[in-house]
């Protein structure tokens, strides 16, 4: 139907000049992004269910709703049939058997920003150039929590990552060959539960008005503010500002020596 095959262009290497416009990732916002399509598809499926139930109950669609797994009449709340009964009818009715499904596509037009902060308490042994993290609290406004337990676990994971890249995790390379020198868990100092104090996560639930379910991002944000909070706590304790991470004993020794806290 095109008339000329040269009108067809196969794109093998994509860049921003030819791909559709994107509004950005803005951290891990899967619930935010997928929520629009989930809600839209759910409403479409509900519409199809009520359409089919209208045939079985001889009720008007606008006079029915789905409540607690049942089709109910909105005027008096009477249960007309359960969803399981409707599913059996839809599947095995010899006269009108059908699969009730719904599909939809939703293009995201909005973005939502998450807000959060971290409070850290440290103990610094200046002669030993050692930092001990005594306490850390991570607070986030991630919109309405869909799964509080999973949200808390997500924050704990981000805090652990922040402690790691803030104090110990550093990938070393051979300057001549570019070969990684510590590409294993023995030499790469990944923080573990033995390096952590109690990890406390708190939430401020401000529902996002542009979101289908009031949610916002909670993927990367917990890992962002932890290391800067530890750095600022070290500065508050010693008066020494450090502009790199991880803040290892070697870095502390160099900076403490430069500031006169350690003398040869």
Label each PLM-derived region with a short phrase.
Residues 1-264:
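C-terminal catalytic domains of large/alpha subunits in multi-subunit enzymes
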